[in-house]
Amino acid sequence: MELNAYIGRAGTGKSKAIIEEIKEKMKQDPLGDPIVLIAPTQNTFQLEQAFVNDKTLNGSLRTEVLHFERLSYRVFQEVGGLMEQQLSKAGTEMMIYDIIQQHQSELRLYQSQVKYYGFSEKLYEQIQDFKKYAVSPQQLETYIAENNLQTRTKHKLQDIALVYKHLEDRINGEYVSTEDSLQRFIEMMDQSEWLKRAEIYIDGFHNFSTLEYQIIQSLVKYAKKVTIVLTTDGDRDLFSLFRKPSESLTHIEEIANNLNIQLHSRQFLDVQRFIHNDLKHLEQNFNALQFEPIPTEGNVEILEASGMREEINEVARRILRENREQGRRFQDIAILYRDESYAYLMESILPQYDIPYNIDVKSSMTHHPIMEMIRSLIEVIQTGWQFDPLMRLFKTNILTKKFKDSQYLIDILENFVLERGIYGKRWIDDKYFDIEQFRKMGLKRQPLTDEERETFERVIQLKNDVMKKVMLFEEKINNASTAIAFATAFYEAMEAFDLPSQLMTDRDTLDVNGEHKKAEEIDQIWNGLIQILDDLVTVFDDQSMSKTRFLELFDIGLEQLEFIMIPQTLDQVSIGTMDLAKVDNKQHVYLVGANDGVLPQTVTASSLITDEEKKYFQEQSSIELSPTADILQMDEAFVCYIAMTRSRAHVTFSYALMGASGDVKEPSPFLHQIQQLYTNLEVQNIHHQHQAEPLRLMEHPHQTKIALFESLKAWLDDELVAETWLDTYQVMRNDTRLNDGLTYLLSALTYDNQTVQLNPSLSKALYGSTINASVSRFEGYQACPFKHFASHGLRLNERTKYKLENFDLGDIFHRVLKFISEKVNGDFKNLNPKQIHKLTTEALSEILPEVQFNLLNSTAYYRYLSQRIGAIVETTLTALKYQGSHTKFTPQRFEASFRRKPKDQSELLATPLQTKQGIPINIRGQIDRIDTYQQGDESFVNIIDYKSSKYSGTLDLTKVYYGLQMQMMTYMDIVLQNKSRLGLTDMTKPGGLLYFHVHEPRIKLAWNQLSEDKRDTEFINSFKLSGLLNSATSVLDAFDTRLEPSYNSDIVPLGLKKDGGIKSNSKVADEQTIYKLIKHNKQNFIETASNIMDGHTEVAPMKYNQTLPCDFCNYKSVCHVDGMIDSKRYRTVDESINPLEAIQDVDLESEGE
């Protein structure tokens, strides 16, 4: 029984001493008594290499490098005693989840938390923490009973104790956790003859848990000799840099006292690691209160970067430079970080420099395609075949790889399913996946070509293949009722999918292609899946459970799976966190992300038990728990100290001034402390360095091209750029080894999202030799020529979705009102409420099933929406009844179509216009309602357009003038061209151009205004027609029969003053002005169509009233217009003009007679 402690500051040769000591014993007696070197898990590989790489050793059977858990198994192999099944972390969490589900009603505080998957993990961590510090459920219960705790704390501890106790009851005698096996190891240590002959060395730890101290005490008691290495100078002060390892030393001394033996301490004072004085000075004075600054020899550096990406790019360049100029191998370099976002950055950036690396971090398997496939499959069953999980299942491409162009087929399937709203068992109903159904997909209604038919057949085959697998999986799962049956069913389903052989084939292919990391991932995923199934069987065996419970437990297990990647090569940069990474004696260590808030880190408690509760527990029970946040905060300087003393020759600190999300960051206060140690240690700004020495950016061809691009871009923007970059461009352009992709990259220098004017032949090929178009198409061109080009030239369309869009709603109202209008022949004024309701019901039952493949009957929400549509229609008809009772105009036509060649007498003729190039312009469309009024030989016509949006239902004469609103003038022109077809006299004149807002009014009144008359008034006013009226006195009273002096109409935008004159707020114009607006509108058509055929496709949106069409445009991702830098492209409207005055310059010639 012997206990030794090797203590000393970092780099004083403690670890070297024990390794040399072990090597010497191995040389002297290779078959002697056992030697065990205990180290943290992440350090065992490095220490094994120290022995394997020593050429003076010819092999030995006596030395093993183990961590505590592996040591316990080594003893169990000798003495037995561990009969129970080992329970993994995932298995324990599943058991905890099952316990809290069963005992939910008994929980005091956490009753509402049990449904959250992450809660079982929190409980696991807390219980594991208790076990590490030897706190049993009984001790917890005693503590709760004997102390007057706050209600919340009491209930919290009662809940944890309840789960902990049930967990122990389940585990006891059948299973064993890691902590339990270590406890058993302590109990059985005295039976091991192998251990009694062993010499134990413990290195790489700074502190231990209570359980580990108990193991150390037993090792000292039963082993021949125990030697512990601690990095400390022996200072026991609470605020000492070495507080943590000094506290461990105190515990080791207590162990010696407990066993009544002497602790042999050996202090190491001579610094051996550092080969440069400035590194020695850094280690010796980092925590010194008094020191003498010295000049740095360039082996301690501090780099300042504008952002994190620039920081890692610079580190990568420096590593390549060291490798090339100093012959330094990658394995002699390490990068330590603390902010997790740096890990993702390095995984992204280092491969661009072809730098081999190994990052010592476990990553979740959750987002791997194989895992996503499994979890999506589970969610499909849980949600009853909902769209989202099913499409995720398809898109993983795991089950569909055997199909050629599977991703393309899946895209088509997604478009089709989105459009048709396929859900649930409709996925396996052939009538929804008939080839003819695909013919109707999107905007296409033409017969299918043979190629399209063959593609759609392959889509259906792919869908059917996957659905058979889903049904097989569901069937097997549905037939199970116990855990073992569920696990068996799951495995059999995977076998039926041929998944194991497919994955092994994929793995072998990746290995052959040199992608060993991806190949290893597939192995780990499959082994992980099998492990979770094993855990489920181990924990629950033949226990009865529901399908839902099994899938929940299985998903919890999958959440715990992580990749543990072993190094793929020996010569690679080591990357790890400052807290855990074990990198010793490297030639160069980079400490990246040395920012305030990271180093030192702001430590916050994340466990279920707060720091205050921990402290009170420790005070009252004298039981030590894991360190609180304030204790951990005190050890932050020690974290920095350990990280920066890992290098023998060079240490570089770096920090960024801006975080990943654009937040401002400050350098670590430790850096200022380090700067004070030297007389000449200056912060090196990376950007300034590169400006002064551009060659420092040229370490790798790929990255040099990017830097070249940025420099040439600055040069084109008239910034000062070093001539070096122009020389670099010439060299790279003329070197076939370096110019790959250079032309493509440099083309972005002069990229401008300017479109090219189409030549006449191309315009004709796109648009045809005749323009057949609706009014809205011309309005769209006026809003932005490129939008017109994208939608009508390139014919780009968003995929149709199975949901009610605004335009669908407008179409429904139009069709319903047409149906009812024709039924009553426009006689709204004589309808009573009963008739209105009956007509509405009849119209909806006729029309709604035809909307979006019966969308409005698909869900409860849409059925409710159907009722709301009915209510709006009834409200609208009530308003139309009121308006019809107070006007002399009578409805004559509803939904009157017009085109160049009318199909029959019911359609109107649209006389073709002609572009400047002589190309015919055939306008087509549909007028919602035409009202007429006859007075002697004169006829007046009202155009009524139904709008479901108040915004679009306003006639803006400025927009009319600029061609942004062409509809109403076009409709009036068409009607005036078709007098005979409409049965009107030759003296037919324009009456009103009016919009009717179809809606359900929301009337807001104060309590003192709440009366039936006031409500009715507000109701009628909300339906008031908007637009423009003919100001001729012969027609004014026809608009509203109640019109008289001092009267404001509540059905049209018209009012009279006391003297009978028209009020200024009335929306009126004289007859000649209306004709001039119509003619100007025609000119807009000709101008617009001419520009279209001239090939104008400019990205030139028209800005009006501080609004851009871009705000509502679907093509922004195509034109790349940027509101910040493309404002010069906007066309603007002169909003100061009076359109009615500006229009007076139009020469009507013979029109309007």
Curated annotation (Swiss-Prot):
Keywords: 4Fe-4S, ATP-binding, DNA damage, DNA repair, DNA-binding, Exonuclease, Helicase, Hydrolase, Iron, Iron-sulfur, Metal-binding, Nuclease, Nucleotide-binding. GO terms for biological process: double-strand break repair via homologous recombination. Residues 1-289 form the UvrD-like helicase ATP-binding domain. Its EC number is 3.1.-.-. It comes from the Bacteria. It is an enzyme of class 3 (hydrolase). Residues 269-583 form the UvrD-like helicase C-terminal domain. Disulfide bonds: none annotated. Its cofactor is Mg(2+); [4Fe-4S] cluster. [4Fe-4S] cluster binds at C784, C1110, C1113, C1119. Binds 1 [4Fe-4S] cluster. ATP binds at G8, R9, A10, G11, T12, G13, K14, S15. InterPro entries: ADDB_N (IPR049035), DNA_helicase_suAddB (IPR014140), DNA_helicase_UvrD-like_C (IPR014017), P-loop_NTPase (IPR027417), PDDEXK-like_dom_sf (IPR011604), PDDEXK_AddAB-type (IPR038726). Coiled coil: none annotated. GO terms for molecular function: 4 iron, 4 sulfur cluster binding; 5'-3' exonuclease activity; ATP binding; double-stranded DNA binding; helicase activity; metal ion binding. Gene3D superfamilies: 3.90.320.10, 6.10.140.1030, P-loop containing nucleotide triphosphate hydrolases (3.40.50.300). Belongs to the helicase family. AddB/RexB type 1 subfamily. The heterodimer acts as both an ATP-dependent DNA helicase and an ATP-dependent, dual-direction single-stranded exonuclease. Recognizes the chi site generating a DNA molecule suitable for the initiation of homologous recombination. The AddB subunit has 5' -> 3' nuclease activity but not helicase activity. HAMAP family: AddB_type1. Heterodimer of AddA and AddB. Despite having conserved helicase domains, this subunit does not have helicase activity. This is ATP-dependent helicase/deoxyribonuclease subunit B.
